[in-house]
C-alpha cells in the first residue's frame, strides 16, 4: 500500500512539473512587446474598478450590462486603457449574447489572439496589442464574410462617435 501511494505521489508531482513547464514554453506573448506599459498602481489610478477588473485581471462583465451591447451609432470602438482603435461600428452585429460583437477588427495588428483554457473551456482570448488589455474572446460562429464573432466587454471599450 505504501508503495502504491509513493508511486501515485510521484505521478502527481511529475504531472504538475510537466504542466507548469509547458505553460512557460508555449507563452504566446513571449515575443510581443507592449508599447504602453504601466504599473498596476498606475492602471488603478486611470481606470474605474470595473474597467481594471476586466482589462487587467481578465474578468468578464455581466451579459446585457455594458454600455455598448445595444449601441447602434456609427463610430470607432477603442481600447479603454490606451485608446488604440480596435473595431469599426460597420462590422458590429447583433449576436444575441448580451455583449458587443464584431466580425472583424479594424486592423489585424490591433489585437492579439491567445489561447485561453480557463474554466475548463478552450477559447481564444483577445487582447489589445498596444497595452495588453483583456477585451473579450473570439469565436468561429459569426456572420459572413469572416465567420468570426469578436465578443467584447463594453467596459474594455471607449466609443468615438462619427463626427457627421
Predicted segments with their positions:
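Bacterial Sec-dependent signal peptides at the C-terminal "C-region" and cleavage site
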Residues: 2-31
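Short helix/turn-capping signatures at newly exposed starts of structured segments
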Residues: 23-46
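A short Gly-Trp-Pro
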Residues: 35, 44-78, 84-164
